[in-house]
From Swiss-Prot:
Pfam families: DAC, DisA-linker. GO terms for biological process: DNA repair. The keyword DNA damage applies. Keywords: ATP-binding, DNA damage, DNA repair, DNA-binding, Magnesium, Nucleotide-binding, Nucleotidyltransferase, Transferase. It is an enzyme of class 2 (transferase). Its EC number is 2.7.7.85. The keyword Nucleotidyltransferase applies. Its cofactor is Mg(2+). SUPFAM superfamilies: RuvA domain 2-like, YojJ-like. It comes from Bacillus cereus (strain G9842). This is DNA integrity scanning protein DisA. Belongs to the DisA family. The gene is disA. Participates in a DNA-damage check-point that is active prior to asymmetric division when DNA is damaged. DisA forms globular foci that rapidly scan along the chromosomes during sporulation, searching for lesions. When a lesion is present, DisA pauses at the lesion site. This triggers a cellular response that culminates in a temporary block in sporulation initiation. Residues 8-146 form the DAC domain.
Length: 357
């Protein structure tokens, strides 16, 4: 899993460097439109130096126009790691011929071998096929047309909206069952599955956003709006149902996100994520601590909620508490005690109304 996370992180860094709106991408697009082809290496370490033959050391500031003009020459362009300087133009690259390559064209084969030998980012711009291919180490990625990415991103947003609706239905149903004291592990796992799918699609959309650069701002806004409060509520759901109250619920949500990136989760995986044995029956009754529901009461800060749960242990304990018992909790006076009682009643009524709408 760590290796996969590292690959994803590397890919994000690469895509941000060549995303639309960046000077480097503008220069690459100019070369692509001119159909001259090109080979660009980012980074000039000892390994790169050992395979560079000839070329002109120009060491000038990067500009899209300079890249376009210099790419007309047959050799490769060597830039610094950040792409802010053009160091060498018309360089001949001589990587180890024994390094495996799946490419057929000379330019792309050289790019792949250089990337594998040095670990540097290499950009190959096809002369005839209008394709930009990125190589770094064993990573290979072909940049897609912006229109294609936007279409895929919009489709992913629509899918996310559907799973958000599934989450809303599931969390509403769970809230009703919590007040009725009839929650089983099955309902909790069902809601966590919807969280898993939302996180999976979120990651896919983020990859599109990274590749879209400045063109992805609207998609990012839609994603932010759709996921508003969902992840925070999912973390409180975990805090409610994890077997160990002391566990860091945000860390467990992050673990769920990491798992969602790599595999489809079984019910037993989610049960184990909550600290229970994998073979735990889904029909087993479970009791919420009450963090998620009480956090919906207006003007009750997290510290007061923590005091409430420490005193009454469960959501039902809080619901059954009298005004006098609530008043005894540190930080809660008579006025706030009444607001808590009224707030819980309003939340319950809202849940029932939501189910029937």
């Amino acid at each position: 899993m760590e290796e996969n996370k590292q690959r994803v992180k590397s890919m994000i860094n690469i895509l941000q460097l060549v995303a639309p709106g960046t000077p480097l991408r503008e220069g690459i697009d100019n070369v692509l439109r001119a159909q001259t082809g090109g080979l660009i290496v980012l980074g000039y370490n000892e390994q790169i130096k050992s395979i560079v033959d000839g070329g002109f050391h120009i060491n000038c500031a990067f500009s899209p126009a300079s890249l376009y003009e210099l790419a007309k020459m047959d050799g490769a362009l060597i830039l610094n790691e950040t792409g802010s300087k053009i160091l060498i133009a018309n360089a001949q690259l001589v990587p180890e011929a024994s390094i495996d390559s799946i490419e057929t064209g000379m330019r792309h084969r050289t790019a792949e071998r250089v990337a594998k030998q040095t670990g540097s980012l290499v950009v190959a711009i096809s002369q005839r096929r209008n394709v930009i291919t990125l190589y770094q180490g064993n990573l290979r990625y072909t940049l897609k047309d912006i229109g294609v990415i936007l279409t895929k991103a919009n489709q992913a947003i629509q899918t996310l909206e559907k799973y958000k609706a599934v989450w809303n239905d599931g969390i509403t149903n769970l809230g009703i069952l919590e007040f009725e004291e009839v929650v089983t592990m099955s309902e909790v796992v069902h809601v966590l599955h919807s969280v898993e799918m939302v996180l999976r699609i979120k990651n896919e959309i983020l990859s599109y956003i990274h590749e879209l650069g400045t063109e992805g701002r609207l998609i990012r806004l839609q994603l932010t709006e759709l996921l508003a409060d969902l992840e925070a509520e999912a973390a409180l759901l975990i805090k409610d149902y994890h077997q160990e109250k002391t566990q860091d619920h945000h860390q467990i949500l992050k673990k769920l996100q990491d798992l969602a990136n790599t595999q489809l989760l079984e019910d037993s995986d989610l049960v184990k994520l909550l600290g229970y044995p994998g073979q735990t029956s889904l029909e087993e009754s479970v009791t919420p601590r009450g963090y998620r529901i009480t956090s919906k009461i207006s003007r009750v800060p997290p510290l007061i909620i923590e005091n409430l749960i420490n005193r009454f242990k469960t959501l039902q304990g809080v619901c059954r508490a009298t005004i006098h018992e609530l008043d005894d909790v540190e930080g809660i006076g008579e006025v706030r005690a009444k607001k808590i009682r009224e707030g819980l009643k309003r939340i319950q009524e809202h849940l029932y109304m939501s189910r029937h709408n």
